[in-house]
Structures are given as structure tokens and as C-alpha cells.
């Protein structure tokens, strides 16, 4: 039997479950979560910190409830180094350091996929190409960056 794929979820995937502003994305995310037992799912302490910053207490409580059932990755010492490289290479703007940390966490914990709905910074060709270059140069495991819908 093949091992389950290891998936890292950024905060946008968790928040999409409860975001009524985009019904299609919400529905696709719900469909993905209905299949979640097929995968090993992870978030990180960065995800938890972003959820804690959520100003809406009801929305925040729902997200905390959802991540409470997901394995949390601890931060490894080399994540900051890779996050810096992601920013210096232009994959992610310095203003969005959290996004670089999500990617670096997924890479350094050898995830198969990073799932995100963040098309502005993460799920885009430029970021994917630069991340592929960084992982190749540093002899790190390649990671696929996709939306939850792409794994349905």
C-alpha cells in the first residue's frame, strides 16, 4: 500500500471553509475536506499564529476548531534561512513574510504538496518556478504548490 501524500495547508485553506464571500471556493474546500482521510494533513505554528490574529471571534473560533484536529508542524531552525532565500529570490515580497514561512515550512518538512488559495503570492507560476529553482539548488525535495481543488 502506498503511503499517504503529505499535505501542508496554509491559512487560506482553513479560512475558505467558513468564508461565505466566495461560495465556489468554499464548496471546493468542503469537498476537499470530505476526502481528507486519504492524506496526511499538516499546518504549522505560523498557521496558528495567523488564525489568532483573526479579528472576528466567531470566524476565529471556527478555524481553531478545524485546525485542532490537524497535526501541527514545529518550526525547524533552517526554515528561516529558506524563507529568506524565498524573499531574496523574488518569489515572495518581503511584506508577505508569513507566506515565505509557509512555503519554507512545507519544504523543510518534506511535504508532497502545499495547498493554498492565495493566488496573489503563493499559487502562481512565478512563485512555483522560483521555488523549484531554490529546492533544486539546495538539493531539497521538490514540492507542488496547488489549490485544494487540484487534488479532488
Which residues make up each language-model segment?
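General small-molecule cofactor/ligand-binding pocket signal
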Residues: 42, 73, 144-146
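Residues at the C-termini of beta-strands that transition into short coil/loop
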Residues: 45, 76, 149
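A residue-level structural signature of the nucleotidyltransferase/glycosyltransferase Rossmann-like core
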Residues: 6, 40, 114, 143-144
Amino acid at each position: 500500500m502506498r503511503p499517504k501524500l503529505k499535505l501542508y495547508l496554509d491559512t487560506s485553506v482553513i479560512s475558505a471553509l467558513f468564508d461565505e464571500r466566495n461560495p465556489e471556493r468554499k464548496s471546493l474546500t468542503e469537498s476537499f475536506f470530505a476526502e481528507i482521510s486519504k492524506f496526511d494533513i499538516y499546518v504549522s505554528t505560523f498557521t496558528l499564529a495567523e488564525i489568532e490574529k483573526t479579528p472576528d471571534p466567531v470566524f476565529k473560533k471556527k478555524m481553531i476548531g478545524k485546525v485542532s484536529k490537524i497535526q501541527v508542524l514545529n518550526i525547524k531552525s533552517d526554515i528561516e534561512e529558506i524563507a529568506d532565500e524565498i524573499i531574496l529570490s523574488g518569489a515572495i515580497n518581503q511584506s508577505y513574510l508569513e507566506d515565505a514561512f509557509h512555503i519554507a515550512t512545507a519544504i523543510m518538512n518534506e511535504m508532497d504538496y502545499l495547498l493554498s488559495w492565495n493566488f496573489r503570492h503563493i499559487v502562481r507560476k512565478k512563485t512555483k518556478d522560483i521555488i523549484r529553482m531554490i529546492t533544486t539548488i539546495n538539493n531539497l525535495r521538490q514540492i507542488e504548490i496547488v489549490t485544494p481543488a487540484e487534488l479532488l
